[in-house]
Amino acid sequence: MAINFKRIATTIFGLAGIAAVIYGVGVTWDLHRTYTSTAQDSDAPDDAQLARGRYVAYSADCAACHTAPGAAPFAGGYPLATPFGKILSSNITSDKDTGIGSWTLAQFDRAVRHGQGSHGYLYPAMPYTSYARMTDADVRDLWAYVHSLAPVNHRVVEDQLPFPYSQRWLLGGWNLLFFRAQPFRDDSTKSVEYNRGAYLVEGAGHCAACHTAKNFLGGDSAAFLQGGSLAGWYAPDLTANPHVGVGAWSVDDIATYLATGSNEKAVSSGPMTEAIENSTQHLTSADLHAIGVYLKAQRSSSDAPAQPVAATDAAMVLGKRVYESQCIACHVSNGSGIRRMIPAFVNSPTLLSNNPATLLHIVLMGEDGPQTHANPTGAGMPRFDWKLSDDEVAAVLTYTRNSWGNAAPAVSAGTVAQARKQLVSQNWIGH
């Protein structure tokens, strides 16, 4: 019997057309449905509500993404690098023309907790997948505070993505796959402190946005808080893993790090420094300790120490020579650094991570230390892109990752070359 290819093709196209119509109807319904919320607009928020809203804004780290370098606070334009292209953050001041001054609380809630803005679906670079867990009260207070911000007329062309990622309607399918708008619920088997930490980490703090690996579509993997790549950096493991996570840290260590940008074991860098300066340093001691309690209770990831690279290995020999000529003055001979200022290398989760991306950033382009209320003049790390070859950078990182009792995979010159090329293309370092 002859195969009727025309009939098969007609059937396939017909089914595809029906699926497209169903999807279009679903997207239209989703973008126009009403969400249930007890939050109500307040015509005249009092000082107490504005203070609560400011605190929620700190906990949600709103300023970090909605403030471009050197620009007015919350006026948008901050470039957010994603695997799919660049997105510019929106203006969330009360300007009615270019900001959200004409919005209602319901529209604000729809954007923050449901990922739907005035132009359709929001990209999940806006962490509505986490903010969905925020309470009605926190959203109401946050709205009161944001609505009180001085208007800044600053029009932002947010969409910078190439086709097909520029098609926002496709995010309806993404949400169907990866987004569950589930409000936070206390775990009755846990303490009040644990639940407060869980609310902050899973909700407003949106820690998983950086510290959980993403799949090829940008959805969260199942490896919750076990580390993830972020615009060329690596957000480390936050589980109780004693090797690459916070298992060797105390609750006080975690709270101190989030409050000041450093502790006895680490000094922040990159996007984490921004988060500390803009967000966590402003949280109460009780909330920081609650975060620590929650993180310490997370099941350890499976990452185990690697076999140490032998001291006689050629990379170790070269690395020791580079370390003694370039690094020893600050990090000292035994890798202990300077307390609360220069990172110690012994049992450092950042140093021992299987992914050396953060280390490569710091060595090649340098890094300013965190500047917080507790540490107003953070130390700086000079750049070495102009001074050290790919082989030398790889060797000194391999040496520090495998000295003083450390054990981590060797870093290759090829990995350094790739990181250098990326930083050059982004104009972070010269050719």
Task: Please report, for each region that a protein language model flagged, where it lies by residue.
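Extended, polar beta-sheet/loop recognition surfaces of beta-rich domains
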Residues: 251, 258, 262, 346-395
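Short, cysteine/histidine-rich loop/knuckle motifs that typically chelate Zn2+
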Residues: 64, 209, 329
